[in-house]
């Protein structure tokens, strides 16, 4: 129980919850634990998100399509992440990415009904979830498209913040054929050069950008 407790305290939805509450949750809630071997698919883009699915161990690789298929964003997700947390409810409740185990990976999941009860019973859980939704809603959906009034740095940071999980690394942004400098604007070539010199990102080819860590890029001030 102690190991499960420690893992649960690191999951975003339980941040700040008391030991007693988490122990009670772990003991009384029907939880499903699964293991996936390297290369196994955990969830597919387009699948209905029916449960709260948490990564407890191992690394997960996610790949999603954005900008109407003109770009693909991939990332490596560490343990304690919740997959598709923003897709549990609403008009679009399908996974927005393919999730594949990079190595042996353990997950825990529980039903939406249980999660709704958690929101009603525990204010900390409710605030954690509301904060996550608020952060996402405050980022304009327009930032996910091409906008002449945004700099290349603003577009790139908005894209990574909205299309990846917190704490992820090894991010790749690939176009379906167009040069990234054309997609991100005339000032992007200079931006990519500065990011390369800083060790934050590297332009692998005209159509692929590698980013070391999400936090490193979001903290970069151009």
Outline where the language-model segments fall.
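Cyclic nucleotide-binding regulatory module and flanking cytosolic helices
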Residues: 1-38, 82-83, 87-90
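Cyclic nucleotide-binding regulatory domains
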Residues: 40-102
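A small-molecule sensor/coupling module
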Residues: 94-98, 113-151
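A short hydrophobic beta-strand segment most commonly corresponding to one strand
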Residues: 105-110
């Amino acid at each position: 129980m102690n190991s499960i407790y420690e893992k649960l305290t690191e999951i975003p939805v339980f941040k700040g919850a008391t030991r007693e509450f988490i122990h009670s949750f772990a003991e009384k809630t029907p939880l499903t634990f699964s293991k996936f071997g390297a290369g196994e698919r955990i969830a597919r883009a387009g699948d209905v998100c029916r449960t709260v699915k948490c990564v407890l161990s191992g690394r997960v690789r996610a790949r999603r399509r954005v900008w109407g298929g003109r770009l693909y964003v991939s990332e490596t997700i560490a343990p304690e992440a919740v997959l598709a947390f923003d897709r549990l409810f609403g008009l679009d409740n399908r996974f927005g990415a393919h999730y594949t185990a990079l190595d042996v990976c353990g997950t825990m999941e529980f039903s939406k009904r249980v999660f709704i009860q958690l929101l009603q019973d525990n204010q900390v859980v409710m605030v954690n979830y509301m904060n996550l939704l608020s952060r996402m809603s405050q980022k304009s959906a327009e930032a996910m498209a091409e906008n002449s009034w945004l700099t290349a740095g603003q577009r790139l940071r908005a894209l990574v913040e909205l299309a990846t999980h917190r704490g992820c690394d090894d991010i790749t942004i690939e176009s379906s054929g167009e040069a990234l400098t054309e997609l991100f604007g005339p000032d992007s070539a200079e931006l990519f050069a500065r990011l390369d010199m800083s060790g934050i990102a590297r332009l692998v080819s005209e159509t692929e950008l590698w980013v070391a860590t999400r936090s490193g890029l979001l903290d970069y001030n151009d």
